[in-house]
Amino acid sequence: MKEVRYFYVPDALHSTELPPEEARHALRVLRLGMGDELYLMDGEGLFLRAEITGQTGHRCQYAVVEELPQARAWLGHLHIAMAPTKMNERVEWMSEKATEIGVDEFSFVDCQFSERHQLKTDRVERIVVSA
């Protein structure tokens, strides 16, 4: 069975190169090479099938083969607001699971009795993208 590899590229249609972190994962970790197939997503519902056309150092170029249709079962918009807990792992787990079930948007709120008043959203964002 063929493994499907998804990569997050924010501007997938207008770009021809994977972002540095994704390129490193494709070339070094998965050891992909010229002609290998990969799937791109922009995080907003666009999915593309692409092929690696070039690699130089830590850079990976691709060509879009086709845009994949995505049927969305529910056309609503689900927004969750949550107060960060004392333990970051719980916030990360909640964000990951909520993304998996189809939550569209997150807001972190600072409540009167919140134990954590600042949250590093970059790690949570990476977890949500990978989910």
Region roles according to the model:
Residues 1-70, 122:
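N-terminal positively charged helical leader segments and presequences
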Residues 71-131:
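RNA substrate-binding interface of SAM-dependent RNA methyltransferases
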